[in-house]
Regions:
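The feature captures the beta-strand-to-loop junction immediately N-terminal to the Walker
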Residues: 25-27
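Helix-to-loop junction immediately C-terminal to a conserved catalytic motif
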Residues: 40
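ABC ATPase NBD coupling module
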Residues: 56-70, 78, 100-103, 107
C-alpha cells in the first residue's frame, strides 16, 4: 500500500438469512456504500470472501454478479435508460443475464405481466408502456427501477439510499412499495438509509456503522 492508503472496511462479518430485510445506518464516511459496492463487485476486496446462496462470488466480476443481485441507487436517473420506452426498460430487466438479440418485440404474455406489475405502483403507468422514461418524474423512475430490480426475484436486493433524492411524500411512497415487494417475494434485502426513523420502521434487522 501507499502512505496515504486508508482501509475502508475491516473485520466485516455479516450473514443474512433468506428473507432478512436488514437496514444499515451510519454517518458519512462510515463505509455503507463501500459495503454495498464490495458485495456488488464494483470494488474488489483484499481479503475474506463474499458468498451468495452458497455461491462464492468474491472473484466474480460485477456483470456476472448481476445474475444474483438486484440494485437500486440513490439517483433515480441511474437505474433506467431515459431515451428508451418504459416497455423497453422492462424488457431489459426481464432478460437480464440472457443473450439479447436485435428483436425488441415482446410476447402478449409479457405485456400483460408488465401491465400487472406496473399497476402495483398505483401511478397509472400500466397504460403508458410506450412513454419515454426520460419524461417521467424522479419518483416514477425510481418506482420502476425498484420494480425492475425485483422482477426476477434476485437472491439479494441492495438499496443504496434509494429514496434520498426524492421529496418526503414520494420517498414514503417508494418505501411503502419497497416493503410490499420485499414481503411479496420474500427477498433478502440490504437497505442503506440516513434516516433513523426509516431504519427502525422497516426490516427485521438493523446494523449501525460508524466511521
Amino acid at each position: 500500500g501507499t502512505i496515504n492508503e486508508k482501509t475502508a472496511l475491516q473485520g466485516i462479518n455479516l450473514r443474512l438469512e433468506e428473507g432478512d430485510f436488514c437496514t444499515v445506518i451510519g454517518g458519512n464516511g462510515a463505509g455503507k456504500s463501500t459495503l454495498l459496492n464490495s458485495i456488488a463487485g464494483v470494488f474488489p476486496v483484499d481479503e475474506g470472501s463474499i458468498t451468495i446462496n452458497e455461491i462464492d462470488v468474491t472473484k466474480m466480476p460485477e456483470y456476472k454478479r448481476a445474475k444474483y443481485i438486484g440494485r437500486v441507487f440513490q439517483d433515480p436517473m441511474v437505474g433506467t435508460a431515459g431515451n428508451m420506452q418504459i416497455e423497453e426498460n422492462l424488457i431489459l430487466a426481464m432478460r437480464r443475464g440472457k443473450r439479447l438479440g436485435l428483436k425488441w418485440a415482446f410476447k402478449d404474455s409479457e405485456q400483460a405481466f408488465f401491465k400487472e406489475r406496473l399497476a402495483l405502483l398505483g401511478l397509472g403507468l400500466e397504460d403508458r408502456l410506450s412513454a419515454r422514461m426520460g419524461l417521467l418524474s424522479g419518483g416514477q423512475r425510481q418506482s420502476i427501477t425498484l420494480l425492475m430490480a425485483t422482477m426476477l426475484r434476485p437472491e439479494l436486493l441492495l438499496l443504496d439510499e434509494h429514496t434520498a433524492a426524492l421529496d418526503p411524500k414520494t420517498a414514503e411512497n417508494v418505501l411503502q412499495l419497497t416493503d410490499k415487494l420485499v414481503a411479496e417475494h420474500n427477498l433478502t434485502t440490504l437497505m442503506i438509509t440516513h434516516n433513523m426513523r426509516d431504519a427502525l420502521r422497516f426490516g427485521n434487522r438493523l446494523i449501525m456503522m460508524d466511521a
